[in-house]
Amino acid sequence: MSDRAFDTPVWHHGKALRKGYTTGSCATAAAKVAALMALRQQPIHQIAIVTPSGVTLNLSVESPHIEGEQAIAAIRKDGGDDVDATHGMLIFARVTLNDSGAISLSGGEGIGTVTRKGIGLPIGSAAINRTPRHTIESAVREAIGPTRGAAVEIFAPEGVARAQKTYNARLGILGGISIIGTTGIVTPMSEESWKRSLALTLEMKRAAGMTRVVLVPGNHGERFVREQMGIAADAVVTMSNFVGYMVEEAVRLGFRQIVLVGHPGKLIKVAAGIFHTHSHMADARMETLVAHLALLGAPLALLTRVRDCDTTEAAMEHIDAYGFQSLYDHLAARICQRVIERLRFTQNLPICDAILFSFDNRTLGSNRPVAAIVEDLRC
């Protein structure tokens, strides 16, 4: 289909995973082929582009249509074996030739609109990121030559529905998907792209003037913060498993207070100095619980029961039965200590807080009174 660099699989946990290509590559290819069709006045069914990473893609063209000096073409998004909300959808380009000598780019149906600062695009503009903007304009210029002009519209009929499965709304991108991709290639299980998308949320909130942020592993944490702590969802950012990365990004951006809120099953790993909490990186949950229970003087019988548990929830039942609920305040304080240690070379250390909760939405523990943490968050 394309060059060897693209066809070579990515190996992840012993499995060969197929690469894909970004919405930016789709839009670039669609715009290029539409421009060529408008110029040549004949349908084209295959198009080649060179991605920003230097990989050549040979892509099949769908729905080619020519009407005068206007042409429409679509490329079907292929995310490879990556988990991708836009996989399989058609990305269209409509190119209308003119004599202006300039290339204009706009977003049509299904392409989101930027409504907030912080993602590097003007408010009110189409959510077509800088790299795809450059590649689209370059591809169209290559196709039409140095003197002609063209109006390029990117659209995606499924965009509104697909966008509901993305983080776009949290980023202030409304009404559709984003046209993104810095390399043009989707690498399966790419943690870097995932981390970057999470960090973008931090950047957007900082650009809006926020200086205090709550970091949670996922939706359960966000719901707890909103419903049990009374904190608005705007103050909450998902960190997934990337605790260390997101804390460092928050510090880099100048946040003055960072509050980690989550279930012990995730956050107790941080108490052990584990800042990537996915199980494939490390799992010292029971060992961490046993160590801190021992420091609190827990009997050997409890330590043994906790050691033999398979889940944190099971261990918590034994901890409650033995009356060692004070463990959670102890763990929360240790989590904060670990975060501060990680940031020890930072000039302006933020306030760090941690709150642990159970699956039934009980507050288990915190490094200081929750009311004081909430009061600071509202400053």
Curated annotation (Swiss-Prot):
<protein>
    <recommendedName>
        <fullName>Cobalt-precorrin-5B C(1)-methyltransferase</fullName>
        <ecNumber>2.1.1.195</ecNumber>
    </recommendedName>
</protein>
<dbReference type="GO" id="GO:0032259">
    <property type="term" value="P:methylation"/>
</dbReference>
<dbReference type="Pfam" id="PF01888">
    <property type="entry name" value="CbiD"/>
</dbReference>
<keyword id="KW-0949">S-adenosyl-L-methionine</keyword>
<keyword id="KW-0489">Methyltransferase</keyword>
<dbReference type="GO" id="GO:0043780">
    <property type="term" value="F:cobalt-precorrin-5B C1-methyltransferase activity"/>
</dbReference>
<keyword id="KW-0808">Transferase</keyword>
<keyword id="KW-0169">Cobalamin biosynthesis</keyword>
<dbReference type="InterPro" id="IPR036074">
    <property type="entry name" value="CbiD_sf"/>
</dbReference>
<dbReference type="GO" id="GO:0019251">
    <property type="term" value="P:anaerobic cobalamin biosynthetic process"/>
</dbReference>
<comment type="similarity">
    <text>Belongs to the CbiD family.</text>
</comment>
<dbReference type="InterPro" id="IPR002748">
    <property type="entry name" value="CbiD"/>
</dbReference>
<comment type="pathway">
    <text>Cofactor biosynthesis; adenosylcobalamin biosynthesis; cob(II)yrinate a,c-diamide from sirohydrochlorin (anaerobic route): step 6/10.</text>
</comment>
